Amino acid sequence: MTPSAISPVAAGWIRRWLILMALMVYAIILVGGATRLTDSGLSITEWRPVSGALPPMSEAAWLVEFEKYRATTQYQLTNAGMALSEFQFIYWWEWGHRQIGRLIGLVAVAGFAFFAWRRWLGQGLGWKLVGLIALGGLQGAIGWWMVSSGIGETERVSVAPYRLMTHFTLALLILAVIAWLWLDLGRQQRAGAPRAAQRAAMALMGLIFVQMAAGALVAGLDAGRTYTDWPLMAGEVFPAHYIHAELGVRSFFEGREATQFNHRLLAYGLWAGSLAAAWAFRKTDVHREFAFLAVLVSAQAVWGILTLVNAAPMGLALVHQGLGVVTTLWAVYTVWRAGGPKTVAEINPPA
């Protein structure tokens, strides 16, 4: 086997492994969303990647963890008087989120080691997978960086919204890389669509990533539970407190009015852009991809409005987040499909 060639059998198993990791990343994104919505993210005050895999196993151990949480600003300002059973509820959400992260790391490293041992990895793919695993390690570190913003000497009762945005956006990037590698190892051919279609697909994908990041800011500030009228905001087209004097430019990241207004504005632009692209490229080889992307964006926009006017209850908010991830993945597929024919044959044709 040449360094750049991968057998069909190897490609099939690697794709199954990538699908498993994609499902696990999707699951951790949803569990992370639930952790945020239940304000559980600060319940574990230490970063113990290995020893933290075991939860408290006795009442005494639970009381030790509870005492650590009682030292946080979140407990003192918002959860004072919380019962142990209530603490256990939020603890399990955060522990579960971290545990899925550990499992993803194990599956990633074990799978890579097995494929390398079998010599199933071409040189190019091997380095790409090393990069993917490195991104996963970075994501774990960023997760703690995010949590640490609400622990210790701080006035925060939740994690810093821009750190939450970074953590969430990197999870999307990891999922996008997994999807791209999975597509590259498949037998479906790229369409080689007109340059205009390729540029439009790239623009829509980029805008979707920006919109998802903006949504993370809204979530981090609970901004979706403050201005719950639509299409206006507190009866105004443009919110009066878009810029807070005490925040200045930080209003774009820390102001509820600015983050929600920007999220709405991006949604309108993305909605119009996806419909325009579906119409403009209706006679190309990627018309189905653009059409379905427009359907997903439309569904996400409508569901977002429904979530907003109901003050973002957990069920609606999680569906909104999950559908957003699916929309992002379809945008990645649209970019991949619209691109030129494969230039590096990584799959050997059957004998």
Curated annotation (Swiss-Prot):
Belongs to the COX15/CtaA family. Type 2 subfamily. It comes from the Bacteria. Its EC number is 1.17.99.9. One of its GO terms (cellular component) is plasma membrane. It is a multi-pass membrane protein. It is found in: Cell membrane. Keywords: Cell membrane, Heme biosynthesis, Iron, Membrane, Metal-binding, Oxidoreductase, Transmembrane, Transmembrane helix. The gene is ctaA. Its main location: membrane. GO terms for molecular function: metal ion binding; oxidoreductase activity, acting on NAD(P)H, heme protein as acceptor. It holds the Pfam family COX15-CtaA. The lineage of its organism: Bacteria, Pseudomonadati, Pseudomonadota, Alphaproteobacteria, Hyphomonadales. Catalyzes the conversion of heme O to heme A by two successive hydroxylations of the methyl group at C8. The first hydroxylation forms heme I, the second hydroxylation results in an unstable dihydroxymethyl group, which spontaneously dehydrates, resulting in the formyl group of heme A. This is Heme A synthase. Pathway: Porphyrin-containing compound metabolism; heme A biosynthesis; heme A from heme O: step 1/1. Heme binds at H263, H320.
